Swiss-Prot record:
Catalysis performed (reactions): D-glyceraldehyde 3-phosphate = dihydroxyacetone phosphate
Pfam families: TIM
Family: Belongs to the triosephosphate isomerase family.
GO biological process: gluconeogenesis; glyceraldehyde-3-phosphate biosynthetic process; glycerol catabolic process; glycolytic process
Residues binding substrate: 10, 12
Subunit structure: Homodimer.
Record's keyword annotation contains Isomerase: yes
Active-site positions on this chain: 95 (electrophile), 165 (proton acceptor)
Gene this protein is translated from: TPI1
Protein name stated in the entry: Triosephosphate isomerase
Organism: Kluyveromyces marxianus (Yeast)
Pathway: Carbohydrate biosynthesis; gluconeogenesis; Carbohydrate degradation; glycolysis; D-glyceraldehyde 3-phosphate from glycerone phosphate: step 1/1
GO cellular component, one term: cytosol
InterPro entries for the chain: Aldolase_TIM, TIM_sf, TrioseP_Isoase_bac/euk, Triosephosphate_isomerase, Triosephosphate_isomerase_AS
Gene3D superfamilies from the UniProt entry: Aldolase class I
């Protein structure tokens, strides 16, 4: 089935008010196909800023993280209600940097995913293996374990986009080949079909999140199970528009 091409831009802890204005205005003036969905994730301090500047119907805004409580004494965290209140519609959960630097477990990410979905935002759920896990040949075992934790808590995947991000490729300039990515994405979809249903799995978009850029994005064009990209550093640059248009 035809799934809407999806491009996520994760700004990470980068950007200023001025630079984010420049990025959003670049998107506003760009020619973006009507059948592409774009989601940008600026730092939390600039969510409101990005939402207010955005003029494109195909573009929406995501938070890079959210906590699993509605409110309370959780210094430094952002609630889903606060994210929604400023007009953001998505949240990125399970990113490898959250798993690695902030020690977020599969179960904790699953709990956050369920809470976010129940609270009315859509989720970009990140999964992926480290270099050590890749070298051991356990990539599929790792991503299935990460998915199973969420499957145990979430039955309705309508508002979930899965992002496969090989950790060894993030910020390193390394990237899986488009054939490698297709093989893993296909296995992920087969796993979801087994656990949910074939029809449900066919509707879930699976993004590639390993150092996608303006040059390599086009090589994924004919890969049936690669439904878009979760872009890191390149989302801060003009080439982000090239990635968005890589399937035109």
């Amino acid at each position: 089935m035809a799934r809407t091409f999806f491009i996520g831009g994760n700004f990470k802890m980068n950007g200023t008010k001025a630079s984010i204005k420049e990025i959003v205005e670049r998107l506003n003036s760009a020619s973006i196909p009507s059948n592409v969905e774009v989601v940008i994730a600026p730092p939390a301090a600039y969510l409101d800023h990005a939402v207010s500047l955005n003029k494109k119907a195909q573009v929406s805004v995501a938070a890079q993280n959210a906590y699993l409580k509605a409110s309370g004494a959780f210094t430094g965290e952002n609630s889903v209600e606060q994210i929604k209140d400023v007009g953001a519609e998505w949240v990125i959960l399970g990113h490898s940097e959250r798993r690695t630097y902030f020690h977020e477990t599969d179960e904790f990410i699953a709990d956050k995913t369920k809470f976010a979905l129940d609270s009315g935002v859509k989720v970009i759920l990140c999964i992926g293996e480290t270099l050590e896990e890749k070298q051991k040949g356990i990539t599929l075992e790792v991503v299935q374990r990460q998915l199973q934790a969420v499957l145990d808590k979430v039955q309705d995947w309508t508002n979930v986009v899965v992002a496969y991000e090989p950790v060894w490729a993030i910020g390193t300039g390394l990237a899986a080949t488009s054939d490698d990515a297709q093989a893993i994405h296909h296995s992920i979809r087969e796993f979801l079909a087994k656990k949910l249903s074939k029809d449900t799995a066919e509707k879930i978009r699976i993004l590639y999140g390993g150092s996608a850029n303006g040059k390599n994005a086009v090589t994924f064009k004919d890969k049936a199970d690669v439904d878009g990209f979760l872009v890191g550093g390149a989302s801060l640059k003009p080439e982000f528009v090239d990635i968005i248009n890589s399937r035109v």
